[in-house]
Amino acid sequence: MSYEVDSKKTILITEDIFKMLPVSSPLSVYPFKNCAVVGNGGILKNSSCGAEIDSSDFVFRCNLPPTTGNISKDVGNKTNLVTVNPSIIAQKYNKLNEKKTEFLENIAAYGDAFLLLPAFSFRSNTATSFKVYHTLKEFKATQRAIFFHPSYLKSLAQFWRTKGVKAYRLSSGFMITSAALELCENVKLYGFWPFSKSIEKMPISHHYYDNQLPKPGFHAMPKEYNQILQLHGKGILKLQFGKCESD
């Protein structure tokens, strides 16, 4: 099988790897009625969107964000699927060669969510993604690791390229938004705001938990956001721009 981005490189799907893959779609109960896709934008701070997010039938999150403590009133607790960037596993948990307990304690907040990994995007992602899978199995964790199919991500990139989104790679948030539109009847996005000021012109951090900016040139964020705005304008999805109304 060819990798998504390293497309000249291939991986042999051995019996051991095949056993790691689900027999049928783990999301076979779709379409879900109301879905929340929660980005990590600083606009979520003091938004009071937590209760609204948690009332959704299915909640998508990106890159293992914090959801516990005071922040939960803004971002919610519920998580059904969360993407995992293997670089986080490498940097924060030393590729799970150690720090397995710390990793398992941190992901406990996600309950029985799916951890979605890009194991077949770059060859360098494979071993770390598999390590997450095996760690969850070894410790009988309630979460389950699943992998993006490289052909799906290639098709997705190809589709958005025809709409003008030409990037080295689509961002996790944009991939998950695209998947949610296929899996859900109604999609609402929270925390998608790639600007340094809010609508009220107040300065905000890049993420709700830090101000670390993305690598320049890797994703086409402005073009992605333009597409999201167009989808919002057409009523295909809803975009939450500011505070949520509390009951």
Listing of model-derived features with the role each one plays in the protein:
Residues 1-247:
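Metal-ion/cofactor- or nucleotide/acyl-coenzyme-handling active-site neighborhoods
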